[in-house]
A protein has these predicted regions:
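A short beta-strand->alpha-helix segment at the C-terminal rim
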Residues: 356-360
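Generic beta-strand structural signal
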Residues: 49, 90-92, 213, 303, ...
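Intrinsically disordered, low-complexity regulatory tails
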Residues: 81-154, 294-298, 344, 348-351, ...
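Structural motif
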Residues: 44, 54, 307-309, 365, ...
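Polybasic/polar functional segments that serve as interface/processing modules
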Residues: 1-45, 49-98, 104-107, 274
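Flexible glycine-/small-residue-rich
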Residues: 100-103, 207, 222, 303, ...
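Active-site helix-to-loop segments that bind/position phosphate- or nucleotide-bearing substrates
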Residues: 120-284, 288-295, 303-305, 317-331, ...
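Glycine-rich/acidic phosphate-handling loop/turn and adjacent ATP-lid/helix
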Residues: 308-344, 383-386
Length: 386
């Protein structure tokens, strides 16, 4: 790293990717910082930079001691051990050591006392909530939010008529001809365990999944202007039901609250929506299928006079970036739900949804909000000609 680049980073102050320390003598404290970065997407620790942005003036002797301290902290104080990279940077006011901590592949990482640390903006904190710890296991592929049991939803909650149609259409067999009891059959389909629906099974086939999963719904609101208003809205709906119903109702809500344009059609034609339906289908399907089901929050669809926002709980998983998804890369967060969604929704499961949405309607922005733990899609509406 060049000194000019280091100065630019220092000028931006610490954040969730950069930490500054004048000097370090405590292995335990350094290990906690490493754990937090390993659990939170990686980052860099700069030793030799004071809180006010000035250089602390480290010497060659300091470099030897600090490199040994980094090695000891990473191998003996972090569980499982990690392998950070170090770089010594020369400045006119002394040396700086940069410690690069990659995002971990064996989350959750802990300190030697079993404490899980994560980054929170420019600081670190202990991860204590069950949901947060579950998300760390999820990011390592050890558990998935869609396979968690839903106590209180059992075989009596199955929408049997809907399931029969699905089963016969996709397996070319009559459900009535199956020798297995329904709980066993649903268990074999990874939708139920010990007679209890998991999240996937409930969202796909329960009559009223929101009975036990009240936050896994879609909240849709249309506002009259460009900002959220506390009391004034044009339309508002809490959309509940099976995921297929939520999908269709969500599409209907957006289409019912945006303009329809005549274009080249005759005067009696219904007009085409200003945002193509195909683009909306891809974006809303992605929101429902790929949201983080360890986050107790609904999908939100917010309509404004100039845009439509689709906000999904959970930022992009692991190392996935906005640039990646625009190129068709994917990381399936909810594999059971995604496998059945290909049979129920206009969803292919091959990472092409964002590409198709952009092809149909390029005026779409994406924000991967790690601090807010959400993914925001903004579809800009066409300005009407006056």
């Amino acid at each position: 790293m060049e000194t000019t680049e280091l100065i630019e980073i220092i000028g931006r102050d610490k954040d969730s990717k950069h930490q500054f320390k004048a000097n370090v003598t405590n292995e335990t404290s350094l290990a906690q910082e490493m754990v937090a970065f390993s659990n939170s997407g990686g980052g860099a620790i700069f030793i030799g930079v004071s809180n006010d942005g000035t250089f602390a003036g480290l010497t060659r002797e300091d470099m030897g001691r600090l490199n040994q301290l980094v090695s000891n902290a990473a191998s003996q104080q972090v569980r499982p051990p990690i392998n950070p990279q170090t770089e010594n940077i020369a400045t006119p006011d002394g040396l700086v050591i940069r410690i690069v901590v990659p995002t971990g592949v064996s989350k959750p990482y802990m300190d030697k006392n079993g404490v899980i640390w994560v980054k929170s903006a420019g600081d670190k904190r202990k991860a204590t909530s069950r949901e947060e710890i579950q998300r760390l296991y999820q990011s390592a592929g050890l558990i998935h939010g869609d396979e968690i049991p839903v106590p209180g939803l059992n075989i009596a909650d199955l929408d049997i008529d809907y399931f029969k149609v699905f089963f016969e259409r996709n397996f070319s067999e009559s459900l009535d001809d199956q020798d297995l009891p329904l709980p066993v059959l649903l268990g074999n389909m990874n939708l139920m365990e010990n007679g209890i629906f998991n999240v996937s099974g409930a969202l796909l086939f329960a009559r009223n999944p929101s009975l036990r999963l009240p936050v896994f719904i879609t909240k849709a609101i249309a506002f009259p202007g460009k900002e959220i208003h506390e009391t004034d809205y044009v339309d508002s709906q809490d959309i509940t039901g099976k995921i297929a119903d939520v999908f269709q109702k969500s599409i209907g809500f957006v289409l019912g609250n945006i303009r329809h344009i005549q274009g080249d059609q005759g005067v009696n034609a219904p007009g085409e929506p200003e945002i193509p339906k195909i683009a909306l289908e891809e974006l809303i399907a992605n929101a429902l299928i790929h949201r983080d089901y360890f986050v107790s929050a609904p999908v939100r669809i917010l309509l404004f006079s100039d845009r439509v926002e689709i906000i999904s709980p959970g930022h992009l998983p692991n190392d996935l970036t906005i640039e990646n998804i625009k190129m068709g890369n994917s990381n399936i967060r909810n594999p059971i739900l995604a496998s059945y969604a290909t049979k129920i929704l206009p969803y292919r499961g091959i990472g092409s949804g964002i590409i198709r949405a952009l092809k149909e309607y390029p005026d779409i922005d994406f924000v991967d909000d790690h601090d807010g733990n959400r993914f925001i899609v903004t579809v800009w509406r066409k300005v009407p000609h006056v």
